[in-house]
Amino acid sequence: MNAATKAIAAQGLARRAFSLGAVKAFDNALQFLLPVVLVRCLDAHTFGEYRLFWLAVGTVMALAPLCMPGALYYFLPRSDAPTRRLYIHQTLAFLACTGLLSALIVSPLNPWMPAALDPLAKYGALVPAFVALWVTSSLIDFLPTIEERIPLQACATISVALARALLVAGGAWLTADMGIIMWLLLATVLLKFALLLAYIGRFHGWGRPWFKAAVFGGQIRYTAPFGLASGCYMLRSQADQWVAATLFSLHSFASFSIAAILSQVVNIFRASVIEAFMPSMSRLEAAGDLKSMMEMNARANAMVGRLLFPILGFVFAFAEDLVRLIYTASYVNAGAVMRVYIAGLAVLVVEVSTVMQLLRQGPFALGANVVVLALSVPLSWYGGVHLGLAGAAAGSVSALYLDRAIMLNRIAAVSGLPVHRQQHWATLGRHLAWTALATAAAWACVHGLLAEANALPRLALGAIIFGAIYAPFNLRRLV
């Protein structure tokens, strides 16, 4: 590949990354704005039930898919059409089975259902029905992107996001009834499931074979270690929320979960960029070009850091003002939790899970994540008991740093590439330093000039000062 071809390919990847980023930004913006409406329509107890419901769904999604949809990034680009169809059919069948099992676990019929979920038991079959369909239809969140049909991915994502936001917000506004909201969420997931079936039928069909034991065995052997490792990783980020749900009232848990929404901002940048780069990284690994694969990962992470660090810095400086403006003063204690989270979210700029997957390091990742999860839960519990609501986030933050240290050293051992050469550390450090400078300057000016002002003028002045310092030296080029 000559220099001109490489440049064109790089530009195409960047455009694809930003296209996916725009779609995911829209989706996450709606998910971000929806609670803004709900806190003004629902009382604190009902809003706590809504957040608890999504925590339960998120925990199911950490384990039930077992990374089967994401692993298609590995299998589909290197397979012919009949084999691709087989992989897709097997993945769909697997998700349907794990979805049904998950539905049983969160059902009131389960005698071992966690006590923290008792507030949801009164909604009967609505919760398990939603869970079963949500797990099964999650394949549509991956498949068009894996097959590089970005416009179709955009249509599917935007359609479901709009339906969910409009139906739930409308139901809350008109009725303030969580039971009605549950029925509307069920309608949304039925739309998502229909889109998945239509996509598979249009591009792959339903022809036989639907299942081959040998092929499925290879698929599950490749996927299971990564799925379990990913599940442990996601459970680490949710464990502190379960601690908060167990130790504190639904109102306090709702405040804690509002702070956790910040992680969605991180996922916008990480997921969109990595999903755009992943097919090309997979092809490079298959061709044996490990150095180029690592360079592509480093470029993706530098792109994420350039945009993510300033967002985290601004939120760190003005957390309480943001909560008052967006979620009302009733949930202002989320501000302290946000600051604790930001200390950990910054390290997520260095995304290495895709590299571990392509290097087939699933068993190691699983073991590491089990160890880190076992350490994070007691830390969160101790922090919650002795330090209050913000202390409950300590476990997941500590776990993030330990995880990155372990994974970077493992990649160095397997690839022969030292840690200091795996990422564009100097670039990331420069963005972080400018973020720290802009954060400190914006905070000092606002607290000096508008100490007693309302949230909006404080945020406006802070944003102007922050942007004036950070943007000229870091955002001149985005690609």
Regions found by a protein language model. Give the residues of each.
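Transmembrane helical elements of multi-pass membrane transporters/channels
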Residues: 16-32, 160, 181-196, 200, ...
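Interhelical loop/hinge segments that connect adjacent transmembrane helices in multipass membrane
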Residues: 1-13, 151, 155, 178-182, ...
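Transmembrane alpha-helical segments of multi-pass transport proteins
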Residues: 108, 160, 371-375, 425-479
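Hydrophobic alpha-helical transmembrane segments
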Residues: 121-125, 154-202, 218, 222, ...
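Membrane-water interface segments that mark the loop-to-transmembrane alpha-helix transition
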Residues: 11, 15-28, 52-53, 58, ...
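Signature of the first transmembrane helix
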Residues: 9-69, 99, 103, 107-110, ...
